[in-house]
Swiss-Prot record:
Superkingdom field: Eukaryota
Residues of the ACT domain: 552-624
Keywords from the UniProt entry: Amino-acid biosynthesis, Chloroplast, NAD, Oxidoreductase, Phosphoprotein, Plastid, Serine biosynthesis, Transit peptide
Subcellular location, record wording: Plastid, Chloroplast
Modified residues (Phosphoserine): S71
Substrates-to-products reaction catalysed: (2R)-3-phosphoglycerate + NAD(+) = 3-phosphooxypyruvate + NADH + H(+)
Entries under Pfam families matching the protein: 2-Hacid_dh, 2-Hacid_dh_C, ACT, PGDH_inter
Annotated PANTHER family: D-3-PHOSPHOGLYCERATE DEHYDROGENASE 2, CHLOROPLASTIC, FORMATE DEHYDROGENASE 1
Description of activity control: Inhibited by 90 uM 3-phosphonooxypyruvate, but not by Ser, Thr, Val, Gly Trp, O-acetyl-L-Ser and Cys.
Underlying gene: PGDH2
Protein name, UniProt field: D-3-phosphoglycerate dehydrogenase 2, chloroplastic
UniProt xrefs under InterPro entries: ACT-like_dom_sf, ACT_dom, ASB_dom_sf, D-isomer_2_OHA_DH_cat_dom, D-isomer_DH_CS, D-isomer_DH_CS1, D-isomer_DH_NAD-bd, NAD(P)-bd_dom_sf
GO BP terms, alphabetized: L-serine biosynthetic process
Similarity field: Belongs to the D-isomer specific 2-hydroxyacid dehydrogenase family.
Length: 624
């Protein structure tokens, strides 16, 4: 009897504001994008403090150096060659030293675009600040070698995220270490602008004494609109409240309870800009926010408003701001960031008497520089070792407590996807996949993004010749025309657990194992988590109960005595260790499915002997 054999391995995609892509935050954690085969035989993945354990061993080769998920060791293998890490801009010494403990570090500054392309082809990781442009051409030049880009800071507009995603490269940033520094600089600009500090300083140094010219405005009782209530915006609001200001904010993604806790009202964009005396910008630069402060926006503002920007230069139309300053709509502006950096010395905006400028100093404190260096070094080193990254910007992110709870279900989801596609004749003709989550929880209480990502990864890996991980699995799936739909069914079980079961169906394809075909005619498998371990609980219409570990042999057979013994003897004679067996049947003494878990991969002769058992109608060998 012929037998079928497939194999597979272990990750999906995405970043906040008026666009639907949320920005990174330390409040979120992301499943690791990859494990490095060159540096790790296997790794235990931790979800914050909880362990994410998987069971796949990986093969160490120079050409296929990055793994997916593996698990018998907590550490990368120090006897193997170290990863090569390219740093193209000045990084704090503490961060560089940390990187040197883990890899071979090449600090090459002021590289030309061509030199950068040559360097990345020999690098496993790249760390940049805001000056290096990591373009699509850079990722193409890397030829799949580059596995993580670290942005030492918050903004990632100098990194082509789409290209990174397509090439399976994780992008991480360092959003927390410079939060206080940026907020303090915003407040410093606000206060110095209100009291004309920079202009008065220049006046005195020019030999003048113009007290009456530089009468300022008080901050107490004034309204500050914080445009973007993320980490920096929150800290600015906190400090402004301490100065006696009334603070309002606009941010479509900010939790209302967090704003209320600080005494901040969340309002609409137009309400914020039309009622504020001071407007402080803290949103990311996205297609939706590019030049969002323009002639139309300024026309809606209160006459005499004062503007502060320590976020990204591109959110302001600089020519429109000059017109607003000349018209007196904007009384003053204090800017730390610009559309082009450094700006032209002839810029009308820079030379305007009512504008205070600094050369992108938001994160420029000794403490912040060291903190950013350490944060990005830890993120990059951790990503190369396969650890969780709380600051990934192009992979699915969920709250840490949610990830901790979902950990065993994430492993289950990937394995179900992997099994399902192996049962679909090696993926031939696979186009439509349906995923059904059964849960006792309300729809809003179940975040399935990571589960979907892992199922997608499990399905795509065996049928793609591309490097596939959680970062690019959805992209590759779309390229292949795969349609993945999700359904949720409320069941009467304990809401203590997020998911009762996950069912993966591959629609309208032939199966190399007829026993996996449901009554509806689709390949269908279902699994649950039992005592923290993923279990396969249903194949087609047959109920089974097997732990998803090692490898799996599925046999469709006549339901008769002695079958377990016959197959067990064949495997035992070939020194193949059986770690579990389970038999499921629909009608007594009719048909049954036997699921056999084995530690080793049986050779072809052993599998042929199993297929030769007269009562076995078909079987398939599957790698988990």
């Amino acid at each position: 009897m012929a037998f079928s054999s497939s194999c597979s391995s272990v990750k999906a995609v995405n970043s906040r504001w008026t666009s639907p892509s949320p920005s990174p935050s330390s409040r979120f954690a992301v499943l690791p994008a990859f494990l490095h085969r060159r540096y790790a035989t296997s790794v235990k993945l931790t979800a914050i403090s909880a362990a994410l354990k998987t069971v796949e061993q990986t093969t160490l080769t120079e050409d296929n150096r990055f793994s997916t998920v593996g698990s018998d060791s907590d550490e990368y293998n120090p006897t193997l060659p170290k990863p090569r890490i390219l740093v193209t801009e000045k990084l704090g010494e503490a961060g560089v030293n940390l990187l040197r403990e883990f890899g071979d570090v090449d600090c090459s500054y002021d590289l030309s675009p061509e030199d950068l392309k040559k360097k990345v082809a020999e690098s496993d990781a790249l760390i940049v600040r805001s000056g290096t442009k990591v373009t699509r051409e850079v990722f193409e030049a890397a030829k799949g070698r580059l596995k993580v880009v670290g942005r030492a800071g918050v903004g990632i507009d100098n990194v082509d995220l789409q290209a990174a995603t397509e090439h399976g490269c994780l992008v991480v940033n360092a959003p927390t270490a410079n939060t206080v520094a940026a907020a303090e600089h915003g407040i410093a600009l606000l206060a110095s602008m209100a009291r004309n500090v920079a202009q008065a300083d220049a006046s005195i140094k020019a030999g003048k004494w113009e007290r009456s010219k530089y009468v300022g405005v008080s901050l107490v009782g004034k309204t500050l609109a914080v445009m973007g209530f993320g980490k920096v915006g929150t800290e600015v609001a906190r400090r402004a409240k301490g100065l006696g200001m009334t603070v309002i904010s606009h941010d479509p993604y900010a939790p209302a309870d967090r704003a209320r806790a600080l005494g901040v009202d969340l309002v609409s964009f137009d309400q914020a800009i039309s009622t504020a005396d001071f407007v402080s910008l803290h949103m990311p630069l996205t297609p939706a926010t590019k030049k969002v402060f323009n002639d139309e926006t300024f026309s809606k503002m209160k006459k005499g408003v004062r503007l502060i920007n320590v976020a990204r230069g591109g959110v302001i139309d600089e020519d429109a701001l000059v017109r607003a300053l000349d018209a007196g709509i904007v009384a003053q502006a204090a800017l730390d960031v610009f559309c082009e950096e450094p700006p032209s010395k002839d810029s009308r905006l820079i030379q305007h008497e009512n504008v205070t400028v600094t050369p992108h100093l938001g994160a420029s404190t000794k403490e912040a520089q060291e903190g950013v260096a350490i944060e990005i070094a830890e993120a990059v080193a951790g990503a190369l070792k396969g650890e969780l990254s709380a600051t990934a910007v192009n992979a699915p992110m969920v709250a840490p407590e949610v990830l901790s709870e979902l950990t065993p279900y994430i492993v289950l989801a990937e394995k179900l996807g992997r099994l399902a596609v192996q049962l679909a004749s090696g993926g031939k003709g696979v186009q439509s996949i349906r995923v059904v989550y059964r849960s006792a929880r309300d729809r809003d209480d179940l975040d399935t993004r990571l589960l979907r990502a892992m199922i997608t990864k499990g399905i795509i890996e065996p049928i793609s010749d591309s490097y596939v991980n959680l970062v690019n699995a959805d992209f590759i799936a779309k390229q292949k025309g795969l349609r993945i739909s999700e359904e949720r069914m409320v069941v009467d079980s304990s809401p203590e657990y997020p998911v009762d079961s996950i069912q993966v169906q591959i629609l309208n394809v032939e199966s190399n194992f007829a026993g996996a075909v449901s009554d509806a005619g689709d390949i269908s498998i279902e699994g649950k988590v039992k005592y923290g371990v993923p279990h396969l609980t249903c194949v087609g219409s047959f109920g089974v109960d097997v732990s998803l570990e090692g490898n799996l042999i599925l046999c469709r057979q006549v339901d008769q005595p002695g079958m377990i013994g016959q197959v067990g003897n064949i495997l035992g004679e070939q020194n193949v260790n059986v770690n579990f067996m389970s038999v499921g049947r629909t009608v007594l003494r009719k048909q049954a499915i036997m699921a056999i878990g084995v530690d080793e991969e049986p050779d072809n002769k052993t599998l042929e002997r199993i297929g030769g058992v007269s009562a076995i109608e078909e079987f398939v060998f599957l790698k988990l």
